Amino acid sequence: MKTWLMGFSEFLLRYKLVWSETWKIRKQLDTPVREKDENEFLPAHLELIETPVSRRPRLVAYFIMGFLVIAFILSVLGQVEIVATANGKLTLSGRSKEIKPIENSIVKEIIVKEGESVRKGDVLLKLTALGAEADTLKTQSSLLQARLEQIRYQILSRSIELNKLPELKLPDEPYFQNVSEEEVLRLTSLIKEQFSTWQNQKYQKELNLDKKRAERLTILARINRYENVSRVEKSRLDDFRSLLHKQAIAKHAVLEQENKYVEAANELRVYKSQLEQIESEILSAKEEYQLVTQLFKNEILDKLRQTTDSIELLTLELEKNEERQQASVIRAPVSGKVQQLKVHTEGGVVTTAETLMVIVPEDDTLEVTALVQNKDIGFINVGQNAIIKVEAFPYTRYGYLVGKVKNINLDAIEDQKLGLVFNVIVSVEENDLSTGNKHIPLSSGMAVTAEIKTGMRSVISYLLSPLEESVTESLHER
């Protein structure tokens, strides 16, 4: 052990001696400083030793490798948006109201101007519907006559029950205020004439019935007389036959008495037959007497029903004509501003369903109506975010609008340039573009491009998709 320690100490001392001697001559061992051109005249191996290779290529290589690694990591982790681009235009939402006439009319008065603010119910235009006023007056006149006819038949109906003519008194209604005295007299005359005609017919039937009853009384009296005569002649005939049996009188006297009895019996049968006939005639006369009243009553009730139906139809017709006149005064359906005013000439003619102006509500918003190509429609859903770029204002300077997909048409439409496309509506959050402190209002009809965000994908997937597509297609055999 002692020997090992001694050897180790000598070893350390030896290294110390060598290091100290070397340290003393360290400057002598340094390579002499030479200029660059001096190194070029040295032997090749010495030149290589004196001028080592620069580290710049190595650093550049390290930098490129690091950049590639970072780019690969970012391409795997980073993602980009998948958007479907659709061209379209700005449109007003369905809350904007188009003002149209219901029929051909003449412009009577223009109340509003372009851009003017209006409140709900304000008058916008006054039109004159062709023939509306004349139709209203005609219907009012016909309706008044129908109501007067109704009163006439109501009075006649009551007169049948009372058997006398009630006093004519018009109801206290607004539409009877303008009835003239001549019209009242004419109506009274018609009522009296019809009532008198019915009374005369009834009187004639009553006279006929009384006549038949008088004839019946006469026949009854004769029947009573011949019943007595027949009874007396029958008694005498029995007496004569008794005397003939006793041979107290001649047979000729019995035959003569028998002839008298037969004549009396025949007369009695004739008058009884006449009584049956007169009874039948009296019954028929009674029916005719009642029929006169019943026919008159049925006629009055039928006329009353027809008049009531006519009043209902004329009332509906009058309401329609009044609605036509009311519709000729066009009012604002909502509060907002007048836009796209197309009527400027009083006395001009407007046609049915022609748009006269548009009332844009105060809180109305814009929408984008865009055409999405068939290849993109499968990835678009309601609620997806979208960016709207207005063609008239470059988005790099004025920005863009933000919106969401509101509705997707489920049926394709044919476009001459794009083929089969789908109509998509995108709601817009703002109605103007902002640049600094300036707001630029947008209007309906401006061309826009809608970029609808349909999803996300990694950058590496985006870069490799062309290669993947090429490889996939190249491995197929035709």
From Swiss-Prot:
Transmembrane intervals: 60-80
Cytoplasmic side: 1-59
One GO cellular component term: plasma membrane
Domain of life according to the entry: Bacteria
Stretches assigned to the Periplasmic side: 81-478
Subcellular location(s) of the protein: Cell inner membrane
GO biological process, one term: protein secretion by the type I secretion system
Task performed by this protein: Involved in the transport of hemolysin A.
Name the UniProt record assigns to this protein: Hemolysin secretion protein D, chromosomal
The organism's taxonomic lineage, starting at the top: Bacteria, Pseudomonadati, Pseudomonadota, Gammaproteobacteria, Enterobacterales
